[in-house]
């Protein structure tokens, strides 16, 4: 019996000591070091999250038959949510589309305004929240399905109550699929 207790104690120490070593050596990763960045003093700004994920480029979407909706989100970016509302005005930006075509050798065509409707372009992100959106409804039956035409619906943040980030141009590539 005494031999079993010694054996169990030996096994416990052979497992416990390496575990303690790992625990204390890994915990050093949690300490602040010279490469720690303090974001607590960064100010708030607004952006289009989908534009940020796609570097202000074309985001292709294929819609089926019928009427389809698409939210264009505006994000209030900050270390913590604000205690006041943030306003933003979103607009259709033909100048950005033209500049994009010229700079990239593309020939995207502005989606005719008769092919979609949108909720208000004047957005308010309530205090304590991060997002608001323009809901775009595409009338798929009106969109020309000619494969030689590439339609784009270009959005931009025209103005906002907080600074506007560089991710403020969203170009939705609209195609009609099966």
For the regions a protein language model found, what residue spans apply to each?
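Hydrophobic helical h-region of N-terminal Sec-dependent signal peptides
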Residues: 17-22
């Amino acid at each position: 019996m005494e031999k079993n207790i010694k054996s169990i104690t030996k096994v416990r120490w052979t497992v416990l000591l390496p575990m303690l070593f790992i625990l204390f050596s890994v915990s050093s990763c949690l300490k602040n070091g010279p490469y720690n960045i303090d974001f607590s003093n960064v100010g708030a700004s607004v952006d289009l999250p989908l534009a940020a994920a796609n570097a202000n480029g074309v985001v292709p979407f294929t819609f089926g038959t019928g009427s389809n909706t698409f939210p264009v989100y505006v994000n209030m970016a900050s270390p913590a949510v604000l205690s006041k509302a943030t306003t933003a005005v979103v607009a259709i930006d033909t100048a950005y589309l033209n500049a994009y075509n010229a700079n990239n050798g593309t020939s995207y065509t502005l989606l005719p305004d008769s092919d979609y409707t949108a909720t208000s372009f004047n957005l308010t992100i309530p205090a304590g929240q991060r997002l608001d959106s323009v809901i775009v409804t595409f009338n798929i039956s009106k969109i020309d399905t000619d494969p030689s035409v590439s339609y784009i619906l270009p959005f931009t943040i025209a103005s906002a109550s907080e600074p506007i980030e560089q991710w403020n141009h969203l170009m939705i590539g609209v195609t009609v699929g099966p």
